[in-house]
Amino acid sequence: MSFASEIKKELTAIETEECCQLAELAALVRMNGAISISRQGYSLDVQTENAAIARRIYTLIKDNYSIAVELLVRKKMKLKKNNVYIVRLKEEVQLLLEELDLIINQYTIVRTISNKYLEKDCCKKSYLRGAFLAGGSMNNPETSSYHLEIFNYYEEHAESLQKLLNSYGLHARLLARKNGFIVYMKEAEKITEFLSIIGAHKALFKFEDVRIVRDMRNSVNRLVNCETANLNKTIGAAFRQIENIKLIERTVGLDQLPDKLQEIAKLRIQYEDVSLKELGELVTSGAISKSGVNHRLKKIDEFAEKIKRGESIT
């Protein structure tokens, strides 16, 4: 089961007050519903590939309206051939749509979120819950970048949904797609807040656990990479120093170096693997600091560079 499916399974088990049930149902019908108009009047199909969501829609309608409801199952013919669940209404459809504020004046479809679902905080959260059940998806936080989105067919509804999300400070963004619009979030903290708002608390804790592990792993990787880079830099410097000392020894001899540089050059050749700090402690004339060793080795490098360029070393 995908992470998004786990969230939706949890959401379909939440019990709410009547006002919140209608807010959730309004989002589900608006986003997943298809209205047909004939001489007999309206008919409504609310379609989903998730059995738990289909049962949720069926129950919300039966609990709040005295309307005959059918629950149909069809086999999807393309691709994975998943089941498609259809909640079908043939009676009192206009009454339902008008009470949910999805149509006005019999035939005018309302594309935005009704103000009656924005008056109470519980209803706003329930509308968002219904919107995620209808069109929400989320990347697996264990294997992908953080991303949660809600798909909408209509731009007006996507814009009002974005506005509702951002009333909670979620920094939701809107993007046009080929066949609709998505409202999405990529910040882990905002996704966590959204899961809390819609009541997906189990999913929230799982998401936070995954996030903590990922952050720790990333911190360790950055630390290892930093230490590896420093080690490579140290090894590279030591290799260069040794090569320069050997060049001086082959060409003009180490005795051409000042005494202090001779001493550190011989120690560098003798103890190739030790750190600058350890090298400084080996100086027989008296231990010197790491920066002191580094200064002398730089002087040796400069001496070697003069030889490479054919310059006078006197």
UniProtKB/Swiss-Prot annotation:
DNA-binding segment(s): 275-309
Protein keywords: Cell cycle, Cell division, DNA-binding
Protein name, as recorded: Probable cell division protein WhiA
Matches recorded under InterPro entries: Homing_endonucl, Sporu_reg_WhiA_N_dom, Sporulation_regulator_WhiA, Sporulation_regulator_WhiA_C, WhiA_LAGLIDADG_dom
Domain of life, per lineage: Bacteria
One matching Pfam family: HTH_WhiA
Signal peptide (residue range): none
PANTHER family attached to this UniProt entry: CELL DIVISION PROTEIN WHIA-RELATED
Entry similarity comment: Belongs to the WhiA family.
Transmembrane domains' residue ranges: none
GO annotation terms (biological process): cell division; regulation of sporulation
GO terms for MF: DNA binding
Biological role stated in the UniProt entry: Involved in cell division and chromosome segregation.
Entry-linked Gene3D superfamilies: Homing endonucleases
